[in-house]
């Protein structure tokens, strides 16, 4: 989808896509990091519909005991990787807005916007590193 949009908006020479685990980044000074980390907690993971459990790898779903393991990691590591005023866009679970905003603010981020998904649930936080 990202590559299609890159061509559609004719920005092939202005964007560099990097698809890698956040722990493996070696350089810093990025303008933008977009992350969709696993954010489902252990209890909710066991309650997921079979069609989700059977078609999605557990590693793509499980956010640890409280669902925030990878959210915390992405926020902390992004703080080191982003340049000043760089943007972090992160997807969250619909009940994770309050704690996610708290973690972001504790790590020096300004909250620009919280977007909702198609069912009206909080789903994505756009923030700026201060």
Where are these regions (language model features)?
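S-adenosylmethionine
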Residues: 1-130
């Amino acid at each position: 989808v990202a590559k299609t949009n890159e061509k559609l908006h004719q920005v092939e020479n202005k964007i560099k896509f990097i698809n890698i685990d956040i722990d493996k980044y070696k350089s810093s000074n990025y303008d933008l990091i977009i992350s969709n980390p696993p954010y489902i907690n252990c209890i909710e993971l066991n309650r997921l519909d079979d069609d989700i459990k059977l078609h999605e790898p557990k590693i793509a779903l499980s956010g640890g005991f409280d669902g925030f393991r990878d959210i915390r990691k992405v926020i902390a590591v992004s703080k080191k990787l982003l340049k000043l005023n760089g943007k972090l866009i992160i997807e969250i679970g619909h009940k994770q807005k309050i704690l996610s905003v708290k973690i972001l603010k504790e790590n020096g981020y300004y909250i620009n916007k919280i977007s909702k998904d198609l069912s009206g649930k909080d789903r994505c936080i756009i923030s700026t590193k201060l």
